[in-house]
């Protein structure tokens, strides 16, 4: 390993540690969420959006970040398609809600290291999905303000047990 590669690896390792263990879920990864359960989580998230007159895109990924289910409501901005997927992937891969990344980044200082983490999306709206105490995937929402995305993601995540 070259010295440059070692330095990059060290910086990325330190950046990951800087996220704070309190924000990382201690849950182990489990088997991937079923398509049936992914659809249920998405339906609950979109029902929350409809109730509030918001348009959203929802994505459900497995623990590795592979897309399991996706749906975009009519008139949702096109940019929200990939953002919802990326929020879900970030939540699954880093075992924490994207709101935790957003909060760490907002504090500045060491929190700025989040920007060096590949695939980390520091914007509220991505939440790991827990079933039987294990992370089986994650949900990501985009289309509204980040707190609206988070509210819909929470509604979807809450039905997975």
Residue positions per predicted region:
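Bacterial N-terminal signal peptides that target proteins for export
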Residues: 1-10
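Residue-level signal for beta-strand positions within conserved beta-sheet cores that form or flank
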Residues: 4, 19, 54
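Flexible, solvent-exposed loop/hinge segments and secondary-structure transition points
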Residues: 23-161
């Amino acid at each position: 390993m070259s010295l440059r590669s070692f330095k990059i690896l060290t910086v990325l390792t330190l950046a990951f540690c800087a996220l704070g263990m309190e924000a990382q879920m201690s849950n182990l990864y489990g088997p991937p969420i079923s398509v049936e359960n992914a659809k249920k989580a998405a339906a609950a998230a979109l029902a929350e959006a409809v109730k509030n007159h918001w348009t959203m895109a929802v994505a459900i990924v497995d623990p590795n970040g592979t897309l399991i289910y996706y749906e975009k409501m009519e008139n949702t901005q096109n940019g929200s398609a990939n953002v919802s997927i990326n929020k879900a992937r970030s939540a699954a891969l880093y075992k924490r809600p994207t709101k935790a990344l957003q909060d760490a980044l907002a504090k500045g200082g060491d929190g700025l290291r989040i920007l060096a983490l590949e695939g980390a999306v520091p914007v509220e709206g991505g939440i790991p999905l827990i079933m039987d105490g294990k992370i089986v995937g994650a949900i990501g929402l985009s289309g509204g303000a980040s707190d609206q995305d988070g509210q819909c993601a929470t509604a979807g995540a809450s039905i997975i047990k």
